C-alpha cells in the first residue's frame, strides 16, 4: 500500500525494493509529525516543534563509514581516510537489510542536494522513522510538488536504525554501518538513529562528485552583504567552531550554515535548512536560532525538557553536549531564498584552539590559506562524535576530513585555483580558548569574535596595523576598535608568558609533524608557508 505523491514510474518497487508495509511518499510536515507522534517516536513541543531523543547514538559514527571498493573508484578514493567495504559485503548487507525491512512501514522523501540547478543531484531518502523524513525535508531542498511526478533519483539513501550489521558477514566494523556504493548509486545506513548521518551522507556524496565538474565542495557556512551577493563570505570549520552562530549575522544575508559549493558562477548552498547546536543557546546572542526552537516542525534533538511545560533546558547536557535543532532555512528572517551568492570576497577559517595559543584573528596569504586548509587544525568539541566528552586538539584536513572521499590535495588545489582566479582575503579565526589552555583559560568572547569579523567583512580591518606572529608567520592586527587589545596578543593573556611560549612551541611542532604527509603533493610556495 502507498500514500502520497510520487512518480508512478519510480516507486520503490521500480528500484527492486518490495515486500514493505505501507510506503508514504513525500508527506509534508504536518503529516510526518502526526505519524511520528502516533508511532511514539517523540513528543510535540512548544509552537509545534518535535522533541526527540536518539538513544545511545547522539553523534556521528565516522569510524563506521565505508566506501565500496570497486574498479571505478579504486584510484580516486582517499583510502587512508575512508574504510573500504567489499562489493560482496555490500551486496549481502543490502540483501539482509531489505529482508529486515519486509512488512515494515517506510517514509520516502524525494529531494535535491544543491541550490544551483546546474550542479544539483536528486536524492531519494527512504527512512524507517517518520521524524527522519521530517528532518531530511528540512536539510535538503524540496522540489515543487508538481515536479515530483517526474522525479527520478540520482542516488538513494536507505536509513534503517533497527537493523544491525554483522561485521563478519558484511565486511564492516561494527553493528552500526554507513556504506556508500558509487557504482550502485546507493547509501545504506543502519544501527543508529542519529539524524546527522542522513545529511552528512549526502554531503560526502557531493564531495566526491563535484570536483570532477570543477566545483569546490566546502564544509562551511556562508553569507553575503544585504542586497549585494557579490560581497560573499564563507566560514570553514568543524562542528562546534561557530559556523552556524557566526554566519547568522543580522547585518548580512544568510546563504547557509554548513555545506556549500563554489562553482564558476559563485557560491551555492547544498541544503535547504540548518542543523544548529543548542547547548547554552542564548536568546540575546542568537535570537534567530533561539526562536526556531518554538516554530512548527523544528526538530529538537536530544534536549532535556520539562514534561509538563515543554520548556527546553539549554544547559542540561546529560543526554549529550551535541543537542541540536533542525529547521528550514526560511525560518531565519534574513536568509537568502535563492541560497546562492557570488565568489567569496572573504574566506574565514574557524578553529577552536584548545591550547589557547592562536590569536582571535589572523590574515593569511593564499599560500598560508592552503596550508591551514590542508592542516585543518581545531579541537573536536564535546558530543559531535561518539566518545568525545571534552575538547581534543586534532587536525581534520579541509576542515572536514570525515566527509572527504578524495585526497586532500584535490580540494586544496581547487581552493587555491578559485582564490587565484577570483581573489579573496583569507582569515584564520580562533573561537577556542584564550588566557590559557582548556581547563585554565576561558572561551573566546563571542562579542569580540563578532566585532573582529565585522571589521574584516566591511573592509575596515584591512587598514589596521598588523604584526607578524613569531610562531606561525601570519599577520595579526595590533588594534581593533571595540576589541580589548590584550585579546589580540595571546601571550599577554596568559599569567605565565613562559608557559605560553612552551605551549606555542608544542603546537608549532604538532603543525609541522602533521603537515609532513602533504609535502610531496604541494608547490614550493605552500611548502615555504609551512610552520616549522
UniProtKB/Swiss-Prot annotation:
Question: Residues that bind substrate, according to the entry?
Answer: 60, 194, 200, 324
- Pathway noted in the entry: Carbohydrate biosynthesis; gluconeogenesis
Q: Where in the cell is it found?
A: Cytoplasm
Identify which cofactors the protein needs according to its UniProt entry: Mn(2+)
Q: What are its GO biological-process terms? A: gluconeogenesis
Describe the task this protein carries out: Involved in the gluconeogenesis. Catalyzes the conversion of oxaloacetate (OAA) to phosphoenolpyruvate (PEP) through direct phosphoryl transfer between the nucleoside triphosphate and OAA.
> Any idea what this protein is called?
Phosphoenolpyruvate carboxykinase (ATP)
Provenance organism: Roseobacter denitrificans (strain ATCC 33942 / OCh 114) (Erythrobacter sp. (strain OCh 114))
